[in-house]
């Protein structure tokens, strides 16, 4: 199963992706994060998250 990180999940695009995600539940596992969960300006935190969750794809919806 492909692991996908979506940043900025509280914005308009992030919200729309959350609505679509269940359609892909059989092939993809989405990890939706907001600023409190993952500060994308903290490079080390981002790389740690990617590594610890085996993320294959990052979709940046953060403004």
Per-range role (PLM):
Residues 1-24:
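N-terminal Rossmann NAD(P)H-binding glycine-rich loop of SDR-like oxidoreductase domains
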Residues 2, 35, 47:
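Generic anion/oxyanion-binding catalytic loop in active/binding sites
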Residues 27-28, 55:
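Short, high-confidence coil segments that cap the C-terminus of an alpha-helix
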Residues 29-40:
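A short beta-strand-loop structural module common to alpha/beta enzyme folds
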Residues 38-59:
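Conserved Rossmann-fold cofactor-binding substructure of NAD(P)-dependent oxidoreductases
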Residues 61-63:
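Conserved NAD(P)H cofactor-binding loop of Rossmann-fold oxidoreductase domains
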């Amino acid at each position: 199963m492909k692991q996908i990180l979506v940043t900025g999940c509280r914005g308009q695009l992030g919200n729309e992706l959350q609505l679509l995600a269940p359609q892909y539940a059989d092939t993809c596992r989405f990890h939706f994060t907001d600023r409190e969960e993952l500060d994308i300006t903290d490079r080390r935190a981002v790389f740690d998250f990617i590594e610890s969750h085996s993320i294959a794809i990052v979709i940046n919806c953060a403004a």
